[in-house]
Design a protein with these regions (language model features):
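N-terminal secretory targeting modules
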Residues: 1-40, 47-48, 52-63, 87-89, ...
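Alpha-helical cap/lid subdomain in secreted, periplasmic
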Residues: 57-63, 78-223
Length: 223
């Protein structure tokens, strides 16, 4: 696996939303067999928790790159940063999540969430006309504290729920299959870490299994 430091890896000024790992980065598999399909996983710090499981599960079947980034919906992301990452392909499957860095007031202007999210999907299809795309909803945001006493954080999580709803509507319109991370974990708050945004190993194992199964399904024509 090759680690690349690109401007596309970005910075996150909100210290609550740290990378939870080796930092914001793109990890690129070393491609030896050019006939083997390629996969790109896109996400925030949550991706750090499950990407290795997916990479291991698909070993020998597909090369898996991972872009761990702190971005939210924006024209700059769609027009500049995302195309720069996609140029590392070509990819046969792109599995993406974008959401935990867009809840702060002012980051995404009113009325722009859906068109920008649609533009994100369009940017992928423009760069990779034959690609299979999968979208994952954002995970729940909890209160801080011990796992046994955690609840949903009322203010931030309500924004996450609304953004998930709007994004899901875009995915229906764009005919993009959905991995509902939120639904998978919302009744398992005891698996949250207690820092509001991140999760424990068992939760990431559930996410990794879900991603592996869905990506493997989309790869069937290539295997």
């Amino acid at each position: 696996m090759v680690f690349a430091s690109l401007s596309a890896c970005g910075q996150e000024p909100d210290k609550r939303l740290h990378a939870d790992g080796k930092g914001w980065r793109i990890e690129q598999a070393v491609v030896i067999d050019k006939k083997r399909p390629r996969v790109l996983l896109v996400g925030d710090s949550i991706l750090n928790g499950y990407k290795n499981q997916v990479i291991k599960a698909l070993e020998g079947k597909a090369y898996v790159d991972a872009w761990v980034n702190p971005y939210h919906q924006s024209e700059h992301l769609n027009d500049v940063l995302l195309p720069a990452i996609l140029a590392n392909g070509p990819y046969d499957v792109v599995h993406f999540n974008i959401g935990l860095h867009g809840w702060q007031e002012g980051r995404i202007k009113d009325g722009t969430f859906e068109p920008l999210t649609k533009g994100y999907v369009q940017a992928i299809r423009k760069a990779l006309p034959k690609v299979r795309i999968l979208w994952a909803s954002s995970t729940p945001v909890t209160t801080k504290g011990k796992p046994a006493k955690l609840k949903l954080e009322p203010e931030i999580n309500s924004v996450i729920v609304e953004h998930n709803r709007l994004a899901a509507r875009v995915m229906v319109e764009m005919k993009v299959p959905v991995n509902d991370f939120y639904a998978l974990l919302v009744d398992k708050l005891n698996l949250a870490r207690g820092d509001r945004f991140h999760w424990t190993g068992p939760a990431y194992k559930l996410l990794g299994k879900k991603v592996t199964e869905s990506v493997a399904h989309e790869l069937k024509p290539h295997l």
